[in-house]
Amino acid sequence: MEKIENTKKLTETLSNKKVKYIVGTTLLSVIGIALPRVFHVIAGSTAGATFLPMHIAVLIAALTFGVTSSTIVAGSSIVCSYLLTGMPTLARLPYMLIELVIYAILLGIFNKKFNSYISLIATIILGRVLYAGVLFAAINVIGLPTYGISVIESIKVGIPGIIIQLACVPVIAKIMNERLNLKND
């Protein structure tokens, strides 16, 4: 009888965790679509490149739910945002998708070994290096146009967004993990 009760409790716990995971991933995807729009309305058309609002939802998902969730948030945010708002532009969409998926994977992996701040800093640095490699390959190996996308320029323009990420993302993820009683996947 005790074994049946323990199995029932385990099933309930797994079910609750799965629901939190699905709902959390969905909400962060919606935030990944809405937040860039809010920034564009408040701060103008260059707000996305400056404040990196779409990155925020992906990074929070990685620290809260792990690699799978953050990759889903990255893909769904980019594609749905484009379909609903036309942002990012179609020319920029594949590069931004690759960039956000790189961040999702790196942060999800690093967060299993290091604290959230170290993980986030390492992700931002290594993510930019890998993104530079993607752009290099797109230009020099595959011959794709990059439409003036520059890693160095994106870092300079995105410094306010990087500061926001470092200041807010680990705190928000910590609060979510505590409130939801989750460990990432």
Predicted regions and their residues:
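Hydrophobic transmembrane alpha-helices
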Residues: 2-63, 68-69, 103-111, 169, 173
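Structural signal for membrane-spanning alpha-helices in multi-pass inner-membrane proteins
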Residues: 32, 36, 40, 62, ...
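Helix-adjacent hinge/juxtasegments
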Residues: 72-112
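Membrane-embedded alpha-helical hairpins and interfacial helices in multi-pass inner-membrane proteins
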Residues: 6, 40-48, 86-94, 113-185
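Alpha-helical transmembrane segments of integral membrane proteins
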Residues: 19-28, 50, 54, 68-73, ...
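Transmembrane helix irregularities
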Residues: 64-65, 159
